[in-house]
């Protein structure tokens, strides 16, 4: 893509959960492994070192049986902001094209507004595929949070 034409993805959702719970759900493997991934996907493995400079790696099996693995490095981890790189692994475990994700958490009374911003897509179809995946993931996330309340 030409410089300056990087398609970005921005999604905003409000959840009936306190920010502290939403933060833990994004930064603790025991929680993230229960919701991260689109509907129909199950977590195969989830490792997270949620601190600036720490790494994560999450493998999930799709409904077709294929395992999809993503990994990255945290750039920032604070109660109101989580920023990390995001890359899919190929069959040999090598990282693919790297993107950047920033999660912002805003307290609204007893609710939390989550804004997800992802940049660095190679093309618009890649962004659109991620939009669909994240939207499905946020449905699972909402159900996970509701079960914790």
Q: Model-derived features: where do they sit?
A:
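Hydrophobic pocket/interface hotspot
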Residues: 22-25, 32, 56, 74, ...
